[in-house]
From Swiss-Prot:
Coiled coil regions, renumbered to chain: none
Domain-related comment: The IMP cyclohydrolase activity resides in the N-terminal region.
Keyword Oxidoreductase: no
Gene that specifies this protein: purH
Keyword annotations of the record: Hydrolase, Multifunctional enzyme, Purine biosynthesis, Transferase
Keyword match Methyltransferase: no
Gene Ontology molecular function: any one: IMP cyclohydrolase activity
Similarity comment text for this entry: Belongs to the PurH family.
Organism phylogeny: Bacteria, Pseudomonadati, Pseudomonadota, Betaproteobacteria, Burkholderiales
Protein name: Bifunctional purine biosynthesis protein PurH
Pfam families: AICARFT_IMPCHas (PF01808), MGS (PF02142)
Amino acid sequence: MIKQALISVSDKTGIVDFAKALSGLGVKLLSTGGTAKLLADAGLPVTEVADYTGFPEMLDGRVKTLHPKVHGGILARRDLPEHMQALEAHGIPTIDLLVVNLYPFVQTIAKDDCTLADAIENIDIGGPTMLRSAAKNHRDVTVVVDPADYAVVLDEMKANGNTVGYKTNFRLATKVFAHTAQYDGAITNYLTSLGDDLQHGSRNAYPATLNLAFDKVQDLRYGENPHQSAAFYRDVATPAGALANYRQLQGKELSYNNIADSDAAWECVKTFDAPACVIIKHANPCGVAVGADAGEAYAKAFQTDPTSAFGGIIAFNREVDEVAAQAVAKQFVEVLIAPSFSEAAKQVFAAKQNVRLLEIALGEGHNAFDLKRVGGGLLVQSLDSKNVQPRELRVVTKRHPTPKEMDDLLFAWRVAKYVKSNAIVFCGNGMTLGVGAGQMSRVDSARIASIKAQNAGLTLAGSAVASDAFFPFRDGLDVVVAAGATCVIQPGGSVRDDEVIAAADEHNIAMVMTGVRHFRH
């Protein structure tokens, strides 16, 4: 039964209302510093911890709750007579509810003008100590670290005579240990990122010790293949607009492959300003287009490779209206992603309940790092977020691209970044015409891309081609020109660049170099 609570919070969201409700249930309130003042100003009967322990706060507040009367009241097991006798002998009442959240360390180090001294002062000591004590003794103590749990605790107390059940206490305790682990992980990441000068502004993006924190969203039916188990986890600091923020409107449970392909589709479609549609199969774009609206973008994207689009993942960067929904509904689709769906569009898909509809708000930001597991280790790199600007391009051929060709080249280059290497992409008029992906030789990717276009009945005459990396020989260039391309965009950087440029001049096509490679594995 909860008779006494200790409240000490940095995030004061909802704390006054929570404390009022506790007081109304007859719970005695203990508090510290700014929290105690806030509660007292709200007219609540609150006892300062310093008055409770008989020992004043000291060292600029560094020592205030580190006292036996606090930790004894938290850690004592109520089912052990010797524990309760010890409390009685020393005049220590039990503390049955602990409400604590920690100094804002992560928010502090996110500031550009943060100093090491600022960071150190925002490392909480008393808070984690109390939290861990209460979480360890969760059979007897309810511990709350998240304001979102205030209502849960109050509801149980009101329903059960000021008592919170063991299952709830256990869940709250696990939340505490996850929170303190993440807190300590953030501190370690920061301190081990500092260089010899210990300056905030020159810290290493890759700390000596890297701690990552993810919360489980759901267990999955299986992994990449049916014999593999799997689960989906969300980054505790999920950036706005990330796939992990999806809201599923209808459809079956997402699979491992659904999530992986959906991420590829969403990341690609977000890069376009005009209404765009991306169709993904096995993490590769098989159709990408922009149009006047979602419906036109889809119609153009689907033309690229209708065969591969079967059972694909489709993403839009605009609301899906009824017209677009009716077009998509004619095909077999696994997942459809958009910032929103009109009510009419939802009605169209209501008749196709197996189609998974995901809403994700378009937003800025992306994952801080790209991670790849290897045997016994982890590769960590910055995200490939480079989008080349026209002024950064270098025309290396005698013929310059026309304005239309330049538009097509930039579109093709944007798509190529999301195609598995080796990647060759034919484009024209705001749509992909042929995609060659994942081949061990660039010339084979070029051949496959042209064959794909032929199979779809699309002409490559006057098309633009993007290559995610340089042409090591002229053979790949010869293939795309023979297929009908009149301009090419590629990074350059080969020892045979001169040979490839000479071949382009021989064919009288335009070639531009970006100086940026987009390998994707």
